Amino acid sequence: MRFADITGQEDLKRHLARSVDAGRVSHAQLFSGAAGYGTLALAVAYVQYLCCRHRRDGDSCGECPDCRQIAALAHPDLHLVFPVNKQGKKSGEAVRSDEFLPQFRALFAERGGW
């Protein structure tokens, strides 16, 4: 996912790219928005820009190994957190967000990615 693939949000995309280019990236980012706003896509595009080996013109290249791994949601530095529902589990059995990642990746691939 590249910034160019996201419709609108030009000021925000430019701000995110400039912060990376200036070396001013905070230790954490929280992306939040209403359904249909493109929040997940924007967050993934930002991570891809951070990790890209060949950034150019305010966007990731989309072709280097890091870009390809992030586009497939398989990069080791990309961590997704999912809300969990503890109902249905045995008491004392911990529910972990990362248990849902294989299902999310399969659903993502099944629906053709972005």
Where are these regions (language model features)?
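Clamp-loader machinery-focused feature within the broader ASCE/P-loop NTPase space
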Residues: 2-114
